[in-house]
């Protein structure tokens, strides 16, 4: 099994290595999907305007579209949804108009109801200014304008924008993540019996994948058998060459105990190891590799708290690179002053779960690799490198 990084890579270097591996693999394949299926994906192409916004001169207020100075004789009414009028207003005339309705040719402004005075004989008067409360055609966006560049995450606002620009579908990237949950002791429903544990990592991965612009596939559940794990990885590698997984997350089996077979299974398949252990607490026994002509593999520790740290360290940078978007944990780095003492580790970077309150970060406590109580109540992790003396620390965000 070829190796690239030495054992126990520095935490920040491991994140860079994961990002670089995703970038070398290239962005995942683009697919054109209906708007209803695009939320959370990443734009694979620029988003052009197919129509102008607005597509004709429209009223920004309920009131009267007027021509020239007042008073004005009201000659009709125009509601939203009406076709633009062919006949132009002439000086001294007006039409009653609804917000969003097309203003007639010749309109110089719109006089809102609240500024209008009704006069005898079907006339109105009031103070207005040229072009006031008229939205001109293409004022916001002209046909052909690029409203968003490729690489933008598809948010609810992006879906609304795309619809307003005339799109029914979008070209997007959403890498697929195959999930292998290992462990003879792991149960997936109900209350575990003596000597068993409930799978707490598998339920986290869809949210982590979404956060990074990817999609987690339903998990495959495996026992602690080397051959079974190798076969599952081989299957993922074959799928990765076609329309299958772009990356694989293996839950458990990344340590070096008697039932941890990930390294040996990867060796059987001739995988290239990129990161073999990360100098961080929790999350030390995490692993990053690439199968020959196949997807990247992230080995997550079996302890749930450690697995979440590995998700932030290796999985999110890898998946976001495959999606062609920034790493969500590093897109907006923060620094905050810790409100309580934290002791650094002599050799490893500590990831301490914190709540953010203004410019301060409050350690949550319950920092145990086997527990999710701490990150479940946190906004992010404070990064505490060896030799740290505080009080400022880098903050890495958690998905919310």
Residue ranges and their predicted role:
Residues 1-19, 205-212, 247, 261-267:
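N-terminal intrinsically disordered, low-complexity, charge/repeat-rich segments that act as generic
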Residues 2-168:
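Phosphate-interaction motifs
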Residues 58, 69, 75, 123, ...:
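C-terminal terminal segments
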Residues 109-118, 196, 265-272:
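A glycine- and small-aliphatic-rich helix-loop capping segment at beta-alpha/alpha-beta transitions
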Residues 133-250, 255:
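Phosphate-binding glycine-rich loops and their immediate beta-loop-alpha structural context
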Residues 212-337:
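Short glycine/threonine-rich loop/turn motifs
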